[in-house]
Amino acid sequence: MAAVCDICGKGPGFGMAVSHSHRRTHRRWNPNIQRVRALIGRGTYKRINVCTSCLKAGKVTR
């Protein structure tokens, strides 16, 4: 499943994991994506991928 929010488009962030000895390896931070049944239009429900910040902000009607 793609780590992208269908509401805001938030995707993974990329960076480096830095150890104590300063060795650097690539890593990614995925957003907290939940698969929810959301109300789309008039009485139509659809399963979409939504990040938890959009859920908390009330951007999705469940």
UniProtKB/Swiss-Prot annotation:
InterPro entries per the UniProt record, alphabetical: Bacterial_rp_bL28, Ribosomal_bL28, Ribosomal_bL28/bL31-like_sf, Ribosomal_bL28_bact-type, Ribosomal_bL28_sf
Record carries keyword Kinase: no
Coiled coil: none
One Pfam family named in its UniProt record: Ribosomal_L28
GO terms of molecular function: structural constituent of ribosome
Any GO BP annotation: translation
S-S bonds: none
UniProt keyword list: Ribonucleoprotein, Ribosomal protein
One cellular component term from this protein's GO annotations in UniProt: ribosome
UniProt xrefs under PANTHER family: 50S RIBOSOMAL PROTEIN L28, LARGE RIBOSOMAL SUBUNIT PROTEIN BL28A
Family according to the record: Belongs to the bacterial ribosomal protein bL28 family.
HAMAP family, A to Z: Ribosomal_bL28
Protein name as annotated: Large ribosomal subunit protein bL28
Gene: rpmB
